[in-house]
């Protein structure tokens, strides 16, 4: 009887979770992105993340006529601002914002440019500077991952749009 209750509980929990539309993040269907060229510096975190996410990608320095799509990272701007202050007037929370300016060069010669923005916040604690620095690093990493994901989705939609024409 106890085993039956456990099975019913697990079954009902899985039905509730699947019915609310919950699904795991992180996977992107990249079947149309077999070969992608990335124009950017190897020191650029976004370029490195793109190489990790797109297994058939290559990093190039100069853009030439290619039969593969090219992602060109034009510029990344980072800004940091105070979100809140405590009663003594010191910063309690910071927000980091990054804007990625990119250019997509598709195999048919079409060029698309755009901007992507992502931000994250973290708590600031003066007495724990090492932990605060780590929080800032984690926030920067999450912003870079979000921008990379958005850029891949933009490339995928641009490729689908040119294939449908």
Where are these regions (language model features)?
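N-terminal segment of the mature soluble domain
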Residues: 29-77
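C-terminal motif of bacterial Sec signal peptides marking the signal peptidase cleavage site
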Residues: 16-19
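C-terminal/domain-edge helix-coil "capping" segments
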Residues: 130-165
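Bacterial N-terminal signal peptides that target proteins for export
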Residues: 1-8
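Bacterial signal peptide processing site
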Residues: 21-23
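Surface-exposed short loop/turn segments
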Residues: 56, 70-115, 121-137, 153
């Amino acid at each position: 009887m106890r085993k039956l209750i456990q099975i019913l509980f697990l079954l009902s929990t899985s039905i509730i979770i699947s019915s609310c539309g919950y699904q795991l993040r992180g996977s992107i269907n990249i079947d149309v992105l077999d070969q992608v060229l990335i124009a950017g510096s190897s020191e650029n975190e976004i370029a490195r993340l793109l190489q990790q996410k797109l297994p058939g990608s290559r990093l190039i320095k100069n853009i030439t006529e290619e039969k593969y799509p090219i992602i060109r990272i034009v510029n990344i701007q980072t800004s940091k601002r105070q979100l809140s202050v405590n009663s003594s007037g010191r910063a309690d929370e910071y927000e980091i914002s990054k804007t990625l300016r990119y250019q997509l060069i598709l195999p048919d010669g079409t060029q698309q440019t755009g901007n992507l923005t992502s931000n994250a916040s973290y708590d600031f604690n003066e007495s724990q500077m090492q932990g605060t620095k780590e929080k800032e690093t984690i926030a920067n990493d999450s912003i870079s991952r979000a921008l990379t994901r958005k850029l891949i989705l933009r490339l995928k939609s641009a490729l689908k749009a040119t294939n449908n024409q």
